[in-house]
Amino acid sequence: MEIGVDIVEIARIRAVYERSGKAFMNKVLTAAEIEQCLAKPDPAVSLAGRFAAKEAISKALGSGIGHKLGWHSIEVLNNEAGKPEVTLHAPHLSYRVSISISHDRHSAVAMALVQPL
C-alpha cells in the first residue's frame, strides 16, 4: 500500500486554462473528465482538483507522469453521488486506487491510496 499527496494553486491552473483553453484540458484530461469539468460553474476549480489527483496517484505509484504513466492513463470521474473514482488505463498497472479531492478558494489538494490487486 502506498500513498501520494499533491496540492496546486487554483490561480495557477486557471491561468494556464485561460491561456491555452482546451489544449491544456485535452493534454491532461480524458473526454469524460473534460465533460464533467465543463459542467461545473467554475471549470478551473474542478480542473485543478483533477490535476492534483493525477499527480497524487502518480506519486503513490512511484512513477510520476511521463515515462511509464501518461495523463490519460489515469481517469478520475465523479460517480452519481459525487465521489471521485479512479480508473487506470494502463495494462501494466494492477492497482486499486482510492482518491480524496478537496479545495478552498486558493488551493486544490488530493490524496491517493494505491493497493496492488
Curated annotation (Swiss-Prot):
GO biological process, one term: fatty acid biosynthetic process
Reaction equations catalysed: apo-[ACP] + CoA = holo-[ACP] + adenosine 3',5'-bisphosphate + H(+)
One GO molecular-function entry: holo-[acyl-carrier-protein] synthase activity
InterPro entries from the UniProt entry: 4-PPantetheinyl_Trfase_dom (IPR008278), 4-PPantetheinyl_Trfase_dom_sf (IPR037143), ACPS (IPR002582), Ppantetheine-prot_Trfase_dom (IPR004568)
Enzyme class of the recorded protein, top EC level: transferase
Cofactor requirements of the protein: Mg(2+)
Binding site for Mg(2+): 6, 55
Any matching Pfam family: ACPS
Subcellular location, record wording: Cytoplasm
Disulfide bonds: none
Domain of life: Bacteria
Keywords, comma-separated and alphabetical: Cytoplasm, Fatty acid biosynthesis, Fatty acid metabolism, Lipid biosynthesis, Lipid metabolism, Magnesium, Metal-binding, Transferase
EC number: 2.7.8.7
GO cellular component: cytoplasm
Entry-linked NCBIfam families: acpS (TIGR00516), pantethn_trn (TIGR00556)
Function: Transfers the 4'-phosphopantetheine moiety from coenzyme A to a Ser of acyl-carrier-protein.
Family indicated by similarity: Belongs to the P-Pant transferase superfamily. AcpS family.
Full protein name: Holo-[acyl-carrier-protein] synthase
Organism: Chlorobaculum parvum (strain DSM 263 / NCIMB 8327)
